[in-house]
Structure formats: C-alpha cells, structure tokens
From Swiss-Prot:
CDD domains for this protein: ASKHA_NBD_HSP70_DnaK-like
Signal sequence residues: none
Lineage: Bacteria, Pseudomonadati, Pseudomonadota, Betaproteobacteria, Burkholderiales
Name the UniProt record assigns to this protein: Chaperone protein DnaK
Function: Acts as a chaperone.
Length: 650
C-alpha cells in the first residue's frame, strides 16, 4: 500500500507532508518552496497554472486568477459572507443552478471544489515527484468550525483531484498532533490552539494525555469564525490605500481590477514587512491614469496605523476563545501551552492579544505554516496502521438537529460532542392521518431552525393513517470520524425507513463529481501531451544550435552534396519549430531527419578529434624521449638520495 499523505488545503497557502518512519517530511514543490500559494489561473490557451506561477501573472490576468476560493467552498450564494466577497474579488462569483456560490473564469462556471482540486492535484504531484511512486490516499485538513456542507465539499475536491480522502481532520487538532508528538513534555497537558489563517479562524482546547504509553489527544471544545482571516487584514490595508489615493488624486481605484490586483499584492507585502519593522513604504508607479497623465502611488504605512486598521478584527478572535474555554469546562489558568497556527499569527498585535487573554506567552517553537500538514501526515500514518501509539478524539463543532412543530430547532447532537457518535430519538405526527413526514436537518446554535444552516431534507412516506401523536418515527443521527452526518428515519409500526447522507440541498451531485473527475483525468493527459511537446521542441532547438555550430567548424571537410543535405534538413526542422501548431510527431520526424543527414558530419568530427588526440599523444611521446636522452648519463637505479642539513645563520 502506498503512503497516505497529509495535505493542509489553506485559503492562502497549502502544504503537503508525509511520514518517513517516525520522522515527518514537509515536501518542497517544483519551485523549491515548502508551501504553495492556493492560487489558480486559467489561461487563454486552456492551460491551468497553480501556485507561484499563477500568482506571478495575477496582475495582468485578474479576472481569471482565482484565490481564497476556500472561503466559498460549501457555501450558498445568498449567504451574507459570500455577498460581501462579491464586491471585493476581481473575479466573478456567480449563483449556480443549485443556489451555491460558484466562480467564473473565461466564461466557464466552476464549482469551488473543482478549483480547489487543482491545488490538491499540485500537492499530490509534489508528493509523487518526491516519493517516485503514485499517491492515491490523503488526509485533508479543514477549519474546525467548517459545517457539514463545507466538509463534504472538501471531500469532493479530493475526489476530483484523484485522491481517496481517508479522513477529514480539523486544522487545530492536526496542529496539536504535530506539537504533542514533537515535544518531550510528560504527563497530561491542556493546550489551546489559536489558528488564524488566510480565510478562517479556529480555536480548540485540547487535552493531551499519556494513557498506558499511548498519546491520547482529546478535543474538549472548539469554536471559531469561518470568514475571518489574513485576507480580511489585507482588505483593510487595500481600503485604506484606496481612500488615501482618492483624497490625494481624486481617483477611485476600487473600480479598476488591474489596480486592485497590484494593491492586493502590495498590501500583503506591507502587512508582512510590518511584522518585523515599524514602517513600510508602498510604492506603485503608473497605478492608473486620467486626462492629466499617469498617476503614481506612494504611501508610508506605520505598524501603529496597521494595528488601528485591524484592531476590531483581532478583537473578534477573542470571543470564540472565551466560548471555547467555557465549553471545555476549564479556566484560562488551566491551559499549559498556547500554540499559534496560521501565517497571520506572526503579527505582533495578534501575539500580544493572545498573551493578554491566556495570560502566558504563546509557544514560538511550532512552525505556523507547516504544523497542520505535519499533523495530517501523522494521522495518515495512524490510519495506515503504521502507528499505534496515537489516539485522536475530535468533536463536532456545531449542534445538529431537526425542525419540529412551530419551527423550533430540536437538537439531536450537541456541539463539542466527541465523534464518531450516534443518537436516536422518537418523534410523531402533527396532524391526524398524516401519511408522510418531511425531516429537515439543521446545524447551528440558534433556538429557531430558520436561524441555522439547513443541511438537507428528506421524506418518510407511507405512514398508516392514525390520530396525531400516535405514529412512532425514530430519527437517527450518525456522525462519522470525518464529521460528516448520516441521517435515517424509520416508522416503527411498518419498519419502513429512509436514510440519507447529508449532501445538503446544494453541493455537487454524484454525476457532477464523476464528470469533474473525468475532466481532471483528461486534463492530466492533455498536460502530459503538452509537456512531451515542449520537450520535443527543446530537443529540436538544441539540435539546430549544435548542428549549425558543427557545420561552421567542420562544414569545409564535407562534400558539397552532404552539406546541402544537412542544411535542407535543418531548414525543414526550423520551419516546423516556428509553426505554433506543429505536433510532437512532426517535430520528432524532422529531428530524426537532421540526425540522419548529419551522420557524415559526426564521423568527420570524430575523426578530426581522434587525429588531434593522436597528434597530442605523439608530441607528448617525443618530448618524453628528449627528456630521457638529456638525463641518460645517470641510470635510474643509480639515483643517489642527497642528505641535507639546514644551516642556521646567526
């Protein structure tokens, strides 16, 4: 069986790791970096760029360069968070036929799992290049506060990328695994994982216990905000720059997508610089132009200014920390360690706020960019059976229930229940002779069902006529280890039952996923063909260069007919290389023709080199003979070793 890789599918950056024995290895991508930007660009020639190459061209192709797509995964178009992003993103966010939020590139509608699958495919390829073998299984991380739809959509993305997702694991839990197995502290410990990433925020309270030599990681509680992260911090800087530029120049940059893309890049860079310095300068020449000519942007931003701009965002992370502590049934003073995860936690103001709340310095010895992928790889090793000393007990982040009479949300499974878990409850009909019941499944903490997230609904039909309250309908909720819900309803009188895996009344259908898997496979084959074509072109170019060079040096040693034959074959190869529509077979045929025509030239070069070597060897032999003739008076056997003394002068 191949290795199960661990993937941190992040909003801003992604990372892949594997276990080698008991050592973890974070794998560098083809650009040599340990993290890959979660950016996907769709080019005019149908090529798809992922990671750094996509980021590099984003300024010139803003409408078809997709980033932060994780914020949309498993979300409905109408959700207020999605509506907020529509006005901020340079690319189009559209409403799919099923009501989900999708994106658009080159006029093609794309589901967020389909786009995220491109990043996962890059991670898969990165691991395969390192291991030298195919990879088909993965553990993928999600924010702890992701709901059922978002988890299902992430699983779908894995399938589209050609991966069997062995487990969906919560990011803070993964970071705790990485921390707990890396550090040598003994005894039971309670840790808080504060995870502020590119698009989401999570906090989990986790107890690490040593039970008979087995490390047990039990999540006591989790809380968070799936629409708060580094992207929002960047946006505050962008809004500030736009406001200042409008005051100075009277030009509104918010409607200019090219300018916005440059501003995004500059804002991210400024934010990072201000983590280590007190002031930075944003300098963007030719940001726009009007009738008076080109406009340049030059603005100094101090750390204090940045902190003022994002103060409320940092503050927003503290309430979930309070709730998590309360739900875990512990006091702040019970927390032994605070772990920071996610790139945004490098901001000094965030670290200061965390220290202020928890009353202790957060640990600095955990890599915030890599810990989550490392934890996923450890969980992969546990699932493959190669590691027996780790037990992970995670929780469901939000309460699950059904809508009952009067639109009330009746909770079946409370938040922070350890998973996997199962719960059954008996309900009855609301009307006399009611022949069917509709069961609506919700997730959330509000008292009324309408205030929560509708995950899906289904009918149980064929209930025998009876007065209201008489039929007994048993509803079963079953949450698997991925945090994904399966619901069943059974009429106890007739034994009739109906079961569903909650796929939401949105989400991708099985047929859509299958089609996307096939498209992805077709793209992989197409990519392979393109790479082979590029290799043939490179080979052709190199052959043209080397043959021309050889002709210049040795052409005069060839007969006229031979030289003409080579030149004609070279001309044909150059023509085929200049033609953009030439395929691999055409190029290979002309390469072969040049190689065949150049055989005589190769023979002449070889003969010439041999002659040169023979000449050099003859000259060296003659020189050696001359030397022995001069020293011939003393036969070698009679050489006398001279003794010498060092004479010191006073």
């Amino acid at each position: 069986m191949g290795k199960i890789i661990g993937i941190d599918l992040g909003t801003t950056n992604s990372c892949v790791a594997i276990m080698e024995g008991n050592q973890v290895k974070v794998i560098e991508n083809s650009e040599g970096a340990r993290t890959t930007p979660s950016i996907i660009a769709y080019m005019d020639d149908n090529e798809v760029l992922v990671g750094a190459p996509a980021k590099r061209q984003s300024v010139t192709n803003p409408k078809n360069t997709l980033f932060a797509v994780k914020r949309l995964i498993g979300r409905r178009f109408e959700e207020k968070e999605v509506q907020k992003d529509i006005g901020l993103m340079p690319y189009a966010i559209i409403k799919a036929d099923n009501g989900d939020a999708w994106v658009e590139a080159h006029g093609e509608k794309l589901a967020p799992p389909q786009v995220s699958a491109e990043v996962l495919r890059k991670m898969k390829k990165t691991a395969e290049d390192y291991l030298g073998e195919p990879v088909t299984e993965a553990v993928i991380t999600v924010p702890a506060y992701f709901n059922d739809s978002q988890r299902q959509a992430t699983k779908d993305a894995g399938r589209i990328a050609g991966l069997e997702v062995k487990r969906i694991i919560n990011e803070p839990t993964a970071a705790a695994l990485a921390f707990g197995l890396d550090k040598a502290e003994k005894g039971d410990r309670k840790i808080a994982v504060y995870d502020l990433g590119g698009g989401t925020f999570d906090v989990s309270i986790i107890e690490i216990a040593d039970v008979d030599g087995e490390m047990q990681f039990e999540v006591l509680s989790t809380n968070g905000d799936t629409f708060l992260g580094g992207e929002d911090f960047d946006q505050r800087i962008i809004d500030y720059i736009i406001g200042e530029f409008k005051k100075e120049q009277g030009v509104d940059l918010s409607k200019d997508v090219l300018a916005l893309q440059r501003l995004k890049e500059a804002a991210e860079k400024a934010k990072i610089e201000l983590s280590s310095s007190q002031q930075t300068e944003i300098n963007l020449p030719y940001i726009t132009a009007d009738a008076s000519g080109p406009k340049h942007l030059n603005l100094k931003v101090t750390r204090a200014k940045l902190e003022a701009l994002v103060e409320d965002l940092v503050e927003r992370t503290i309430e979930p920390c309070r709730t998590a502590i309360k739900d875990a049934g512990v006091k702040v003073s019970d927390i032994d360690d605070v772990i920071l995860v996610g790139g945004q936690t490098r901001m000094p103001k965030v670290q200061e706020k965390v220290k202020e709340f928890f009353g202790k310095e957060p640990r600095r010895d955990v890599n915030p960019d890599e810990a989550v992928a490392v934890g996923a790889a450890i969980q992969g090793q546990v699932l493959s059976g190669d590691r027996k000393d780790v037990l992970l007990l995670d929780v469901t982040p939000l309460s699950l229930g059904i809508e009952t009479l009067g639109g009330v949300m009746t909770k079946m499974i409370n938040k922070n229940t350890t998973i996997p878990t199962k719960h059954a409850q008996v309900y009855s009909t609301a009307d006399d002779n009611q022949g069917a019941v509709t069961i609506k499944v919700f997730q959330g903490e509000r008292e009324m069902a309408a205030g929560n997230k509708l995950l899906g609904e289904f009918n149980l039909e064929g209930i025998p006529p009876a007065p209201r309250g008489v039929p007994q309908i048993e509803v079963t909720f079953d949450i698997d280890a991925n945090g994904i819900l399966h619901v069943g309803a059974k009429d106890k009188a007739t034994g009739k039952e109906n079961k569903i895996t909650i796929k939401a009344n949105s989400g991708l259908s099985e047929a859509e996923i299958e089609k996307m898997v096939k498209d992805a496979e077709a793209n992989a084959a197409e990519d392979h063909k393109l790479r082979e074509l590029a290799e043939s072109r490179n080979q052709g170019d190199a052959l043209v260069h080397s043959t021309k060079k050889a002709l210049t040096e040795y052409g005069d040693k060839l007969e006229a007919g031979e030289k003409e034959k080579i030149e004609a074959a070279l001309k044909e190869l150059e023509d085929v290389l200049k033609n953009a529509s030439s395929d691999k077979a055409a190029i290979d045929a002309k390469v072969e023709a040049v190689a065949t025509a150049s055989q005589k030239l190769g023979e002449k070069m070889y003969a010439d080199m041999q002659a040169q070597q023979a000449g050099a060897a003859g000259a060296a032999g003659a020189a050696a003979e001359g030397a022995s003739a001069q020293g011939g008076a003393q036969p070698a056997d009679d050489v006398v070793d001279a003794d010498f003394k060092e004479v010191k002068k006073d």
